[in-house]
UniProtKB/Swiss-Prot annotation:
This is Uridylate kinase. It comes from Streptococcus thermophilus (strain ATCC BAA-250 / LMG 18311). UMP binds at residues 54, 74, 135-142. InterPro entries: AceGlu_kinase-like_sf, Asp/Glu/Uridylate_kinase, Uridylate_kinase, Uridylate_kinase_bac. One of its GO terms (molecular function) is UMP kinase activity. CDD domains: AAK_UMPK-PyrH-Ec. One of its GO terms (cellular component) is cytoplasm. ATP binds at residues 12-15, 55, 59, 163, 169, 172. Keywords: Allosteric enzyme, ATP-binding, Cytoplasm, Kinase, Nucleotide-binding, Pyrimidine biosynthesis, Transferase. Its EC number is 2.7.4.22. The keyword Cytoplasm applies. PANTHER family: URIDYLATE KINASE (PTHR42833), URIDYLATE KINASE PUMPKIN, CHLOROPLASTIC (PTHR42833:SF4).
Length: 245
């Protein structure tokens, strides 16, 4: 077997990825299909963490715009991410993959609290760790959660597994047929160009901690494994990448 490019990764999934064609809620067959892809990678000895958004169940910003207190709206979203994490953990366990959910808010009846040292021990024992409930504070996105946790666990890369999006373009390819896809970008170029891969806080965290971002289409079977083993899939963002004009 080829040597993997990344030995410890954090996979960032949107909540909508769990909703399937419905677009909202949780579609269990879809979750099970994603879990199977992740399990195949775990079987290769790769250490895996997951962060899953909650947009399939709740979105804090629109709720706040409709009049709800923003802090309460964001805490509600954190509960949504935990629901997604528990469903994904169960799907992985059904495949025989030892998995732990760690939450930034104490929910000891259903998950472990987030403790960095414990997470690292789980990786050493071959377990997948799913980080839920954001960073435990309002106003921070799950993108920022992914970047922060990736830095804390010394992840080699953040895999931005997108639902039907195959990389980063200089314009919206759905609106502009001449849009150009980048194979490689630097973190600095992403920030300068205002490319909306992840939010600004997460982008800066990734740059400062020298963490690669790989944006790719998760709907293509086997893509997660291809990225980890170094195939040129999607767009790679790093501090060392050469910008494709």
């Amino acid at each position: 077997m080829a040597e993997p490019k990344y030995k410890r990764v954090l996979i960032k999934l949107s909540g909508e990825a769990l909703a399937g064609e419905k677009g909202v809620g949780i579609d269990l067959p879809t979750v099970q299909a994603i879990a199977k892809e992740i399990a195949e990678v775990a079987d290769s000895g790769i250490q895996i963490a997951l962060v899953i958004g909650g947009g399939n169940l709740w979105r804090g910003e629109p709720a706040a715009e409709a009049g709800m207190d923003r802090v309460q709206a964001d805490y509600t979203g954190m509960l949504g991410t935990t629901m997604n994490a528990l469903v994904m953990a169960d799907s992985l366990k059904q495949l025989g993959v030892d998995t732990r959910v760690q939450t930034a808010i104490d929910m000891k009846s259903v998950a472990e609290p987030y403790i960095r040292g414990r997470a690292l021990r789980h990786f050493e024992k071959g377990r997948i760790v799913i980080f839920a409930a954001g960073i435990g504070s309002p106003y921070f996105s799950t993108d920022t959660t992914a970047a922060l946790r990736a830095a804390e666990i010394e992840s080699d890369a953040i895999l931005m597994a997108k639902n039907g999006v195959d990389g980063v373009y200089n314009d919206d390819p759905r609106k502009n047929a001449d849009a150009v896809k980048f194979d490689k970008l630097t973190h600095v170029e992403v920030i300068k160009r205002g490319l909306k891969i992840i939010d600004a806080t997460a982008s800066t965290l990734s740059m400062d901690n020298d963490i690669d971002l790989v944006v790719f289409n998760m709907n293509e079977p086997g893509n997660i494994k291809r990225v980890i083993f170094g195939e040129q899939i999607g767009t790679t963002v790093s501090n060392k990448a050469e910008l494709r004009k």
